[in-house]
């Protein structure tokens, strides 16, 4: 099949028929900052399934999400993960000994703590008899941690799971070059002075050039920013639309922060520094200021900039998941049910960031729901262009038929229900921790707004995606 990003969209003018095909209603910032919808009474059926245990979220917390290179810069990942676990223990008062298993997601691993879930659990005082493992699935690593926990509970293997994620972008592993690594390993194996001198004679100063962590996709050699730029062009998403959406995200996040709606954030006393109490990447600006920024990836004509992209972030999250009967027996009032979920993958070169478009209809069909049934949408915002391209794909019968094998489009999420408390563009995106933030935002919004169903969705590196249905627990 001809790739969507090369034909028929290259050199596409904004006023083309394709742009009209994929047009969406204007994203007026002022219209999207109105008060949240009035609390509404829902009478929809529950998604409980016969003979399958109900899995509930008791509560979840996260450290403040901070710009990398700020207050967390001297920490290690397990420090942040431990802080999230400690915050969860304080928030829920759950006895450590009842936790059956701990699962954390992370992406860029610190080699000293490759199983960061285990190290953080021990540091937080959990029993050394409590197993813990770490998963990685790019930006949906915490989602994978949660759904692994759901599977363990639903199958009867466990009753109580702690799932979460962590990322510390302030201190990523920087390696010696491969030639230098090989030389040092060979020197370590050398048995005589002659062998060592022979190896040392092969040393060259360029061996000392460091090997930085890869920022591009291994399979395509393209950065995610480049892919986002090409995707925005393919779907005729303008620079102005992207900036408007980013401004919306920051403005809504600031409003939510000021009103105390980001209740999942727990204070963290950074050793040797002050206590951090809130996210520090929320920065409402103006369209005029944002328009001054130059393209970050495809220069000089790209539309993805630092202002309409998520930023490198440090942070951790943790969530207490239980079998419903266990939670009630312990006296908890859960916040939400974790219902159906779906993982998808598609061509990483052509459709790297379209995971939500593919995952959403599958999880809705699995749950027997439609877009109209969803009261709170929480999508991961990697880039404004990524979100808006997904919107246009989801709202296109043509895309559904030609690329998804569907007869009708998925449908466009109503903006008045979408990421109402900000998103990754403004709150930050610690790769391994974002999934838990999304689920807790959906659960807390459902309680606040009186809705019943939330839809969480995210894209991920490698052309993968995830979607999950969250159902409010009856009050």
UniProtKB/Swiss-Prot annotation:
Please give the residue positions where the record annotates the modification N6-succinyllysine: 73, 189, 191, 273, 292, 294, 333
- The name on file for this protein is Trifunctional enzyme subunit beta, mitochondrial
A GO CC annotation recorded here is: mitochondrial outer membrane
The residue span given for the transit peptide is: 1-34
Q: Which residues carry this modification: N6-acetyllysine?
A: 73, 189, 294, 299, 333, 349, 362
UniProt superkingdom: Eukaryota
- Stated EC number for the protein is 2.3.1.155, 2.3.1.16
| Subcellular locations according to the entry | Mitochondrion; Mitochondrion inner membrane; Mitochondrion outer membrane; Endoplasmic reticulum
Query: Which keywords fit this entry according to its UniProt record?
Result: Acetylation, Acyltransferase, Endoplasmic reticulum, Fatty acid metabolism, Lipid metabolism, Membrane, Mitochondrion, Mitochondrion inner membrane, Mitochondrion outer membrane, Transferase, Transit peptide
Intramembrane portions: 174-221
Active site location: 139 (acyl-thioester intermediate), 459 (proton donor/acceptor)
Which residues does this entry assign to the site Increases nucleophilicity of active site Cys?
429
Q: Which organism is it from?
A: Pan troglodytes (Chimpanzee)
Q: Which reaction does it catalyse?
A: an acyl-CoA + acetyl-CoA = a 3-oxoacyl-CoA + CoA; butanoyl-CoA + acetyl-CoA = 3-oxohexanoyl-CoA + CoA; hexanoyl-CoA + acetyl-CoA = 3-oxooctanoyl-CoA + CoA; octanoyl-CoA + acetyl-CoA = 3-oxodecanoyl-CoA + CoA
Q: Name one GO molecular function term.
A: acetyl-CoA C-myristoyltransferase activity
Q: Which InterPro entries match?
A: Thiolase, Thiolase-like, Thiolase_acyl_enz_int_AS, Thiolase_AS, Thiolase_C, Thiolase_CS, Thiolase_N
Principal subcellular localisation of the protein: mitochondrion
């Amino acid at each position: 099949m001809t790739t969507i990003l090369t034909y028929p969209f290259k050199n596409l003018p904004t006023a083309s028929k394709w742009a009209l095909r994929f047009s969406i209603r204007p994203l007026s910032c002022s219209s999207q900052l109105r008060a949240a919808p009035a609390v509404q009474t829902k009478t929809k059926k529950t998604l409980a399934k016969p003979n399958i245990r109900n899995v509930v979220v008791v509560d979840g917390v996260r450290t403040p999400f901070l710009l990398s290179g700020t207050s967390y810069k001297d920490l290690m990942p397990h420090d942040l993960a431990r802080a999230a676990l400690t915050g969860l223990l304080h928030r829920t008062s759950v006895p450590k000994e009842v936790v059956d298993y701990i699962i954390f997601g992370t992406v860029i691993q610190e080699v000293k703590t490759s199983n960061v879930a285990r190290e953080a659990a021990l540091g937080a005082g959990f029993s050394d008899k409590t197993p813990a493992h770490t998963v990685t699935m790019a930006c949906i690593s915490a989602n994978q941690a949660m759904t692994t926990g759901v599977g363990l509970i639903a199958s009867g293997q466990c009753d109580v799971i702690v799932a979460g994620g962590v990322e510390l972008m302030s201190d990523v592993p920087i390696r010696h070059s491969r030639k230098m690594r090989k030389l040092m390993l060979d020197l370590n194996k050398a048995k005589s002075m002659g062998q060592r001198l022979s190896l040392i004679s092969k040393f060259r100063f360029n061996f000392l050039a460091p090997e930085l962590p890869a920022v591009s996709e291994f399979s395509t050699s393209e950065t995610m920013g480049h892919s986002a730029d090409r995707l925005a062009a393919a779907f005729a998403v303008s620079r102005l639309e992207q900036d408007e959406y980013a401004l919306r995200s920051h403005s809504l996040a600031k409003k939510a922060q000021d009103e105390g709606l980001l209740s999942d954030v727990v204070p963290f006393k950074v050793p040797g520094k002050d206590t951090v109490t809130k996210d520090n990447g929320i920065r409402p600006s103006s369209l005029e200021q944002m328009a001054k920024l130059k393209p970050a990836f495809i220069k000089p004509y790209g539309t993805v900039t630092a202002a309409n992209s998520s930023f490198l972030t440090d942070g951790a999250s943790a969530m207490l998941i239980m079998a419903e009967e266990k939670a009630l027996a312990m006296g908890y009032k859960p916040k939400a049910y974790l219902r159906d979920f779906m993982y998808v993958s598609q061509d990483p070169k052509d459709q790297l960031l379209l995971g939500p478009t593919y995952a959403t209809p599958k999880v809705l069909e699995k749950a027997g729901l439609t877009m109209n049934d969803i009261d709170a949408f929480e999508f991961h915002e990697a880039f404004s262009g990524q979100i808006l391209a997904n919107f246009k794909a989801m709202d296109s019968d043509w895309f559904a038929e030609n690329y998804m094998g569907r007869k009708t489009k998925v449908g466009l999420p109503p903006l008045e229900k979408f990421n109402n408390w900000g998103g990754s563009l403004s709150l930050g995106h610690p790769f391994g921790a974002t999934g838990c933030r999304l689920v807790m935002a959906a659960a807390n919004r459902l309680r606040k707004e009186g809705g019943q169903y939330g839809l969480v969705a995210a894209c991920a590196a490698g052309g993968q995606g995830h979607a999950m249905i969250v159902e409010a627990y009856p009050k």
